[in-house]
Design a protein with these regions (language model features):
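Beta-strand/loop nucleic-acid-binding surfaces
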Residues: 21-40
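Canonical P-loop GTPase G-domain recognition
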Residues: 129-178
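Helix-rich effector regions associated with P-loop NTPase G domains
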Residues: 7, 37-54, 58, 64-86, ...
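Structural detector for short beta-strands of small beta-barrel domains
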Residues: 1-7
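Phosphate-binding glycine-rich loops and their immediate beta-loop-alpha structural context
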Residues: 82-92, 96-150
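Short, acidic/hydrophobic/Gly-rich beta-strand patch recurrent on exposed beta strands
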Residues: 10-15, 28-30
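Walker A/P-loop
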Residues: 176, 181-182, 186
């Protein structure tokens, strides 16, 4: 599945080798009635019947949705029970973040890391706009997490990133204005993804309005997704959040039994309070998320009791 727009899906046929070819015709497809309201997203592998010639004006039917190997999800905010599937079957999640204009946000990256690990996708941090600021300081925030960091400014070679994504299905996410579409155009010359400018208040202009999978010259796919303003994690469990961050997971080994890691007064001896530097900042941000997720669980328990 390479495109989705208003009840129509674009599908490229493969040759059963497991990797779709980059030069196949895009079939215009509708969802078969027997699939009901099954959510089919970019990255899904599907079975189609009917006219599969790809000629203009033809329409095939999607009759089967294959099991997904990974699912990247998000919610509008941390209290929203409605999950949105960003992409299916991605192997890599390229978290695109500018080091300036707009200023980088550690919270967004960390939330994307949680969603990636929860969805079975391997994250890679891609730092853009290195011509405007030194990316080293922001990259250091994640040094203890073992996440690959690739500097992808317009003056930096794109080959290191191409080496990573070659032969794989990679999804790109990022706030509007961080240079995601520019990066896509470098990965897939001729993709002609629209690029925009950042407004005077540091907010980007949405230039990618629909997700689309683009074939890489060396094999594999780059899935460009619309710029996002929020990355809610209401669908993630508190245990998953802590397991994502190696520095936090190592620290809570020293917590007393029964510690919920929510901090005082409930957990006055939580080991997260003893961390320093980037780990302490991350622990406090994660704690805020844990409080919200715990409130969600308590609310669900109250509903069940009713």
């Amino acid at each position: 599945m390479v495109t989705k727009d208003r009840g129509r899906w674009g599908v490229v046929l493969d040759d059963d080798s497991g990797t779709p070819p980059g030069d196949g015709a895009v079939l215009n497809c509708m969802r078969a009635r027997e699939l009901g309201r099954t959510n089919i997203v970019v990255g899904d592998r599907v079975g189609v019947v009917g006219d599969v010639s790809g000629r203009e004006g033809t329409l095939a039917r999607i009759v089967k949705l294959a099991d997904r190997t990974s699912v990247l999800r998000r919610t509008a905010d941390d209290n929203d029970p409605f999950e949105r599937i960003v992409v299916a079957n991605a192997e890599l999640l390229l978290i695109v973040c500018a080091v300036a204009d707009p200023p980088p946000r550690t919270g967004f990256v960390e939330r994307a890391l949680v969603a990636a690990y929860a969805g079975g996708v391997t994250p890679v941090l891609c730092l853009t706009k290195s011509d405007l600021a030194d990316p080293a300081e922001f990259a250091a925030e994640f040094a203890e997490l073992g996440v690959p960091v690739i500097v992808c400014g317009v003056d930096d070679p794109v080959e290191p990133l191409l080496d990573v994504v070659g032969g794989k299905v990679s999804a790109l996410i990022g706030h509007s204005g961080v240079g995601k579409s520019t990066l896509v155009n470098r990965l897939v010359p001729g993709a002609d993804r629209a690029t925009g400018v950042v407004s005077g208040v540091g907010k980007g202009r949405h230039t990618s309005t629909q997700s689309v999978a683009l074939p890489l010259a060396g094999g594999g796919w780059a899935i460009d997704t619309p710029g996002i303003r929020s990355f809610g994690l209401a669908h993630v469990t508190p245990e998953t959040v802590l397991d994502v961050f190696e520095d936090l997971a190592a620290a809570i080994v020293d917590c007393p039994r029964g510690c919920t890691h929510l901090g005082p007064p409930a957990d006055p001896e939580c080991a997260l309070d003893k961390l320093e530097g980037a780990s302490h900042r991350r622990a406090m941000a994660v704690r805020g998320l844990l409080v919200t997720l715990q409130d969600n669980e308590d609310w669900e328990l109250d509903i069940d009791r009713d």
